[in-house]
Amino acid sequence: MEILKYLLILSLPIIALFISKKYSAFVDSILERARGYYLFLCHIERMLGSYLTPPHRLGDGFSHPSLEDMMMRISAGDSLIDAYRACCGSLPSSVDETLTEFFSDFGKGDVSLELRRVREAISRIDAALSVEGAEGEKQKKICSVIAPSLAIGLVIWMI
C-alpha cells in the first residue's frame, strides 16, 4: 500500500505538468485558428481589390493549416457562412461574432462596400487578437503556476 502512495506522490507533479502543457497548447490553437481567419480576410481583401472573384474561388491561393477544411468546403461550392459554421471550431467570442457577421453578409453589396466591410473586419479581428493574445498568455502563466502548486500541495498533504 505504501508503494501506491509513493507512486501517486511521484505522478502528481507529472500530471500537473501535463495538464499545464495541454492547456497551453489549447490556448495556442485557438489563437492560431483566429490568426488563420485574419490572414484569410487579408487574402479576401487582396482578391477583391485586384479583381472580382466568385465566392467559391476565394480560397484559391490561400493556405493555412487551421483552415484546410473550410477552404475545401468553399472550393466545393459552400457559401462562406456555411463553410465557416461547419468548420469554425473554438474561437474567441469577439472574433466569432465579427466573422459570422462578415461571412453572413458577404456578396450582398458592391465591391467598394465589400472592401470597406472586409477592412473593418480585419481591423476588429486584429484588435481582438492583440487583446486575446495578451489574455491567453496570462491564462497560460496562471495555469502553469496553479497546476504544479496544487500538485505540490497535495504531495505535502499526503506525506
Task: Give the role of each language-model region.
Residues 16-19, 23, 97, 104, ...:
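Generic signal for short, ordered secondary-structure residues
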